[in-house]
């Protein structure tokens, strides 16, 4: 007698049913990450400096949160709900090298990510979970090769150095509670990097 085949079961993915927060979610990489995480069954939260888009689509974040550089502490309650935080925001002043360009780039590209990283790490210490929390930090190709914009390069290299420094000084318990992933991508065309 023939036996019925078992029903196909959806494959479980590493990020299925996990909550992923992405800064810079409306940029080229942020959109691509959002699509990938959604396809693997994750809930995606976009963190934006802009007014959040109205309505939803099947490819964007499930919800949006507004935030501002310098006001990272206001995100603590939201950060505590995340399993993975992807720090992917930034600006490129192109050829601008004024004091304002330098200050703005350092603040947005390096210091705001550094503060968010510290806050998320502190949350991971108080919020031990079955699976470790993760933080992904996009430092940019400017960390490993010259960028067209010197100010962009300096600010992204600073972030990369801070992430490396912090990663090297964590104890084994901290490493088990929070995984730090440093993303150093090759150049790709985007609004931030139109070349």
PLM regions and their residue ranges:
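SDR active-site strand-loop-helix element
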Residues: 23, 47, 88-89, 132-142, ...
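Conserved glycine-rich Rossmann-like NAD(P)H-binding loop of the short-chain dehydrogenase/reductase
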Residues: 39-56
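Rossmann-fold cofactor-recognition segment
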Residues: 51-73
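Conserved NAD(P)H cofactor-binding loop of Rossmann-fold oxidoreductase domains
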Residues: 86-95
